[in-house]
Design a protein with these regions (language model features):
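The catalytic "switch" region of P-loop NTPases
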Residues: 90-108, 112-206
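P-loop NTPase nucleotide-binding core
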Residues: 1-106, 115
Length: 206
């Protein structure tokens, strides 16, 4: 296990690796998006298969990759060894070069807190790690504005971030949007959802 001070940092690594692995799986198997990926580029990534990531048959979600990483590297030593592999830097460069020739890809992470109530402090660290990782991706132009990760975190997680020593970085950050769910906003949300439902979901009053 990791010390309290290390947990958020380790979660940052988990999210980084999960995001990269998910992108790699899409580059290799997403035929609707990867049409401009050359066989040469695919082969560059396949050199790392079964070491850094498995052989993919289908595109994998970031959630799936988080789960797979945690199940395969469940001890302190095994995770640290995985995180310290020099191949990660190589993969990051290769992925960045490939993405430059592709359409932008978007990932949406909005249900990290489904288990929050069962272990709030554990999931607090998880979500903080996600937030810090995404903000670091935003500031690090490795992927040429082609990789976009949109996340949703709980209000108390954001409050904890704003109480940290680095809080000034995120005050008035243009990429952070606070959702204020007043009555009008909730009404608009539900009416928009209802408007998109098919007729078969409505009761015929006749």
């Amino acid at each position: 296990c990791f010390s309290e001070a290390e947990i958020t940092e380790k979660w940052m690594y988990v999210w980084k690796f999960a995001i990269l692995r998910s992108v790699v799986s899409n580059i290799l198997t997403n035929s609707e998006w990867n049409q401009d990926v050359t066989e040469s580029d695919k082969n560059k990534l396949l050199e790392y298969a079964n070491d850094i990531f498995p052989k993919y048959k289908v595109p994998m979600t970031i959630y799936s990759e988080v789960r797979n990483i945690l199940s395969h590297y469940s001890t302190r030593n095994s995770f640290n060894e995985y995180a310290e592999k020099k191949e990660w830097d190589e993969i990051e460069i290769i992925v960045g070069d490939i993405l430059k020739n592709l359409s932008p890809i978007y990932f949406f992470i909005d249900s990290v807190d489904e288990e929050y109530g069962h272990a709030p402090m554990y999931w607090l660290r998880c979500q903080k790690g996600l937030f810090y990782r995404v903000m670091r991706l935003l500031r690090k132009d490795t992927y040429g504005n082609k990789l976009h990760v949109i996340i949703c975190i709980r209000d108390n997680v954001m409050a904890s971030i704003c109480e940290s020593e680095h809080h000034t970085r995120y005050i008035n950050e243009e990429h952070v949007k606070l959702l204020n769910w007043d009555y009008m906003t909730i009404q608009y949300f539900f009416e928009s959802k209802i408007a998109n439902l098919k007729d078969c979901y409505f009761i015929n009053e006749d």
